Amino acid sequence: MAGLRVIRFPYFLQRWEKLAMHGGGILNKLKSNPLYYLMIPFFLLGQLRAVIGLLRSEKFDLIHAHWLIPQGFIAALSLLITRRKIPLLCTSHGGDLFALKGKGLQRLKRWVMGKSAALTVVSTAMKKTVVDMGVDPEKVEVIPMGVDLKGLFTPDPSVQRKTDELLFVGRLVDVKGLEILLEAMPKVLAKYPGMRLTIAGAGPLERKLRELAGELNITDKVDFLGMTPQDKLPDLYRRATLSVFPFVVTKSGVQEGFGLVVVEAMGCACPVIAGDLPAMNDTIKNGENGLLAPSGKPQALAETIIKLLDDPELRARLAGEGRKSVVQKFDWEVIAGKYAEVYEKIISMKQLE
């Protein structure tokens, strides 16, 4: 991409540098194998060294760090060490805000927020959480994740939509609530025995989810596609009867900060059901452009799925309104414009000092 330079920093033996690779993110990597904890100091030091080197060798107008920890912390610490007076913008995507709840980590997050010229979060619910931590509301902007809703995630009338397929897309991790969806399936199948569930995604819970499908005697009704390239997702959304995203709050308090796949599905005019977490309120207006089901409750989820399967007219209305609503709010052109405004505001404030 023109104007974009990617600098990769080494932090371990190359064949072991998998801490931030696919598989559910760093937190889930740590859960999958405790040996990954040994890499964290090297990861932090490698990133710190790379950022300090850049700050000392080049001139920047702004630093934009994604995630409060570790990237926000590394950026703030690098500025402190180099004594560079460069404004810092931090974006929280949810996992860093809702997880990492120890007192020391909470203090660290507040320190990063205090060192930031501005903060962006991906949902209104997250802004409330940040403000509750003592951050000035004027310092926080809600800018959701963007989606290519005009080129990639679009409807295609030539693709025949099925009448017997539920679709889930996402990482196979606790916060996605797939166990709830699997537990809801027997009730759905009791009324719609020909229904199938397609799961597009990979992650550390795959084996456990396959075992659960076996225990529920629905193995022959569930298709695990594994990791699916992004350019293959639109046709999955276009063919599915409806998409289901049963997001939950985990025992440790982790929850979805936004739910990008919900926007992707709606962009393809696929009717959507999602768990009723606070972050979903920015995307789904229940009964208007999608349906919300009580989070963490398999029977309630099954009833919501059946309600939508029973009503083709409702599915068509939600699909149309869903597409219309997300294009107005989440297309990349809209999101890029919002970030440009924040960048200009921060840089101009720095110039006035």
Q: Regions from the language model: what does each represent?
A:
Residues 125, 146:
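Carbohydrate-associated surface elements
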Residues 238-253, 270:
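Acidic donor-binding loop of glycosyltransferase active sites
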Residues 286-287, 291-298, 307-313:
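Conserved acidic donor-binding segment of nucleotide-sugar-dependent glycosyltransferases
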